[in-house]
Amino acid sequence: MPDPMRSYLDFEKPVAELDSKIDELHALAAGGSNIGEEIAKIEEKALAALTELYAALTPWQKTQVARHPQRPHCVDYIEGLITEFTPLAGDRKFGEDEALIGGFGRFRGESVCVLGQEKGFSTETRLKHNFGMARPEGYRKAVRLMEMADRFGLPVLSLVDTAGAYPGIGAEERGQAEAIARSTEACLKLGVPNVAVVIGEGGSGGAIAIATANKVLMLEHAIYSVISPEAASSILWRDSSKAQEAATSMKITAQDLLRFGVIDQILTEPRGGAHRDSAAMIAKAGDAIAKSFADLSSLDSDAIRAQRRQKFLDIGRKLG
């Protein structure tokens, strides 16, 4: 789990100052000072400031929130939503990739296959999970698990949180592009319902490889894009400092993507972002996932494939 000490983003400085003042006053109150009324006033002011700030986030600020180090990760959602989770390892071709977690468990009493990118929350775990950037063996593991889920009639849940597939030389030598394509194809071929939730970053093919789903949900302050704002600004303007401008131009927010029909639902985050109340966010995501699976439960295998195929064809026709 992330460090319980709250971390503030640069644009949250006014809120950080108020929270610091509140902490100081609470310390004084613990020493016997009668300042409860003053504390209440500043807490109300801090809450109002946080509400106002998060009601008008820019796309670049949402990018920062999506990357917040204390935002709940894939492992947190699995821990909060999946019981009897049994992770499976390896692609049966090259090796294991811990950037992409996959396994089977129970979601609200029903067996389910779970896939998700895990970024890690400390130096050690970030290195272990390669910062959530999967290699070819990660996507081939995903294909293996999706094929197992299809064989046994189990729905698939994908938790998306990656800056993108790993671009290293070794990954390219082992067929990164082909692995992503095969994983996307496996999603499209599934005869069981699949639901994807973009919980943080949805970066390019690395995300779509497990998010080509019947239903795509997205957290309010998550992002979903073909390339990072920093990389886009470097390519388009030869200047990485234009990342804020790129973020706006690329239409990467949940609000933009819902309007374009790329996603199906926005999950409202707690005031101040998912990291301020992880338990509430995970519970809300669980309810939305359950409803999505219920909505698809009446469809047979052919109808499930047809609905998914038509969904992505419609996106291409609308935005192409």
Swiss-Prot record:
Its EC number is 2.1.3.15. Pfam families: ACCA. It is found in: Cytoplasm. It is an enzyme of class 2 (transferase). One of its GO terms (biological process) is fatty acid biosynthetic process. It catalyses: N(6)-carboxybiotinyl-L-lysyl-[protein] + acetyl-CoA = N(6)-biotinyl-L-lysyl-[protein] + malonyl-CoA. PROSITE patterns: COA_CT_CTER. GO terms for molecular function: acetyl-CoA carboxylase activity; ATP binding; carboxyl- or carbamoyltransferase activity. Residues 42-295 form the CoA carboxyltransferase C-terminal domain. Keywords: ATP-binding, Cytoplasm, Fatty acid biosynthesis, Fatty acid metabolism, Lipid biosynthesis, Lipid metabolism, Nucleotide-binding, Transferase. One of its GO terms (cellular component) is acetyl-CoA carboxylase complex. Pathway: Lipid metabolism; malonyl-CoA biosynthesis; malonyl-CoA from acetyl-CoA: step 1/1. Belongs to the AccA family. NCBIfam families: accA, AccA_sub, PRK05724.1. Acetyl-CoA carboxylase is a heterohexamer composed of biotin carboxyl carrier protein (AccB), biotin carboxylase (AccC) and two subunits each of ACCase subunit alpha (AccA) and ACCase subunit beta (AccD). Component of the acetyl coenzyme A carboxylase (ACC) complex. First, biotin carboxylase catalyzes the carboxylation of biotin on its carrier protein (BCCP) and then the CO(2) group is transferred by the carboxyltransferase to acetyl-CoA to form malonyl-CoA. This is Acetyl-coenzyme A carboxylase carboxyl transferase subunit alpha. It comes from Rhodopseudomonas palustris (strain BisA53).
